[in-house]
């Protein structure tokens, strides 16, 4: 299928050929000069009309040619928008299907009109078991933290280490080194 610019070029060629054929000299077939002059005036008027019509057609074709790139750009943009809409609709459809699946799962587990199935009961048991294990692990972590504190205190007492004194010495050394390097101690 030819595109619009090929069709327009073809029409221009036909119009140009029509102009060339109209400019051929007229043959003198008439018997008297009056009829020949009348025929020349008639053909001159019709030639002027044809030329005006041809110029008008050429102007309209030029106008169409100038609008053609804009139309192509609009079609391209519409295709992109159409593709984006298709993608959005596809995503919405997927989300809707996911929500429906989730609704079915939730409604089967919570629906008071449906008895508790074996699957639901098993799931509930697993959740309760995990909650119980989580509680036990929290207790054990707290116990381990307490044990570490107790062991640290016992170690410090056995070796006669004054933890507060050690911390104060380290802080004093840092302040001293900052003072030597010329750093401001208020940057903390």
Curated annotation (Swiss-Prot):
Residue spans crossing the bilayer: none
GO cellular component: archaeal-type flagellum
Residues forming coiled coils: none
Keywords from the UniProt entry: Archaeal flagellum
Principal subcellular localization: other
InterPro entries noted in UniProt: FlaC_arc
Record's keyword annotation contains Disulfide bond: no
Localization terms from the record: Archaeal flagellum
Any Pfam family matching the protein: FlaC_arch
Family assignment from sequence similarity: To M.jannaschii FlaC.
Identification of the protein by name: Putative flagella-related protein C
Gene: flaC
């Amino acid at each position: 299928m030819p595109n619009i610019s090929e069709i327009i070029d073809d029409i221009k060629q036909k119009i140009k050929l029509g102009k060339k054929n109209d400019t051929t000299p007229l043959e003198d077939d008439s018997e008297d000069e009056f009829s020949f002059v009348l025929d020349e005036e008639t053909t001159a008027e019709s030639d002027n009309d044809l030329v005006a019509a041809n110029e008008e057609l050429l102007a309209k074709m030029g106008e169409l040619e100038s609008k053609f790139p804009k139309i192509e750009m609009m079609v391209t943009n519409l295709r992109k928008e159409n593709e984006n809409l298709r993608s959005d609709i596809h995503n919405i459809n997927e989300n809707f299907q996911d929500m429906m699946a989730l609704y079915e799962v939730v409604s089967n587990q919570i629906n008071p009109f449906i008895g508790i199935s074996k699957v639901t009961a098993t799931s509930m048991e697993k959740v309760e078991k995990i909650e119980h294990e989580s509680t036990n692990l929290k207790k054990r972590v707290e116990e381990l933290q307490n044990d570490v504190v107790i062991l640290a205190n016992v170690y410090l007492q056995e070796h006669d280490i004054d933890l507060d004194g050690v911390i104060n010495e380290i802080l004093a050394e840092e302040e001293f080194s900052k003072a030597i390097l010329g750093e401001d101690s208020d940057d903390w």
